[in-house]
Amino acid sequence: MSTLTNGSVEIHYEDHGGDGRPVVLIHGWPLSGKSWSNQVPALRDAGYRVVTYDRRGFGESGKPGEASSYDYDTLTSDLDALMTELDLRDASLVGFSMGGGEVARYIDTVGEERLHSVVYAAAVPPCLKKDDEHPDGALTDDDVRGMQEQLAQDPPAFFDDFTTNFFSAGGELKVTEDERQEAIALAAQADVHAAVQCIASWVEDFTGGLRKSTVPTLVIHGDGDGIVPLEVSGQRTAQVVDGAELHVVSDGPHGINVSHKDEFTSALLEFLAR
């Protein structure tokens, strides 16, 4: 197990090897770096240096609880620490779901000096918030508070329901029950306080980072995503980022890197090879 320390928080990461360009895979909520198990072997076999890590409060990373903030500036500082610790250059960042927020915020606050390209996979940018300023958003303040309260009251029940929605499109579960249970097991590793606080971070506005982006960008999203709707996120990100490519996975739920792993991995490899 490899770790780095950012401030007082230990961040667990895995450097899976490979001599080619670095590819950093950033996991979704409430999972861990192990959620990329369908992609890591293929990327490594293609010659890339594949790096995964666990967000603070999740997986095997440190769980500072109330001693830490879980806003995206803090979370992105962990990504920046990883990039610096491993001296990753000419790297591709692949952010799934919540991980797309770190990608956009990294570009916004750190820049693109170390980057070759980026991928937003079923990702939260540009902005999920629904209010007077964002009337077409997906989540109101009441929605956020409601989810936080439900999770805090009964984490196992919340994660059971969430993973069903995570992997469903059109009312149909698109993965095996074993695959869903694997996701529940990863979610169970999360610190509940961190998981609750991260829900509030989902609705941060990432438009600034998207507008600054100049590196090649792939947006891949399922058209049946009931967690982060394509119309609110993927389509808009592709419109905001100049020259971005949009790949829509037909009948794809939120967890497309599992449900449609072959299509997802193929699209990712094709993009990275350019």
Regions found by a protein language model. Name each.
Residues 212-252:
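Conserved loop-alpha-helix segment in the C-terminal half of the alpha/beta-hydrolase fold
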Residues 7-68:
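Conserved HGGG/HGGXW glycine-rich cap/lid loop of the alpha/beta-hydrolase fold
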Residues 73-91:
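Conserved acidic catalytic loop of the alpha/beta-hydrolase fold
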Residues 242-274:
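Catalytic active-site module of serine/aspartate enzymes centered on a nucleophile-bearing elbow/loop
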Residues 104, 108-109, 113-153:
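Flexible "cap/lid" loop of the alpha/beta hydrolase fold
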Residues 27-29, 91, 95-97:
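Conserved alpha/beta-hydrolase "nucleophile elbow" surrounding the catalytic nucleophile
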Residues 129-130, 134-138, 149-211:
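Conserved alpha/beta-hydrolase catalytic His-Asp/Glu region
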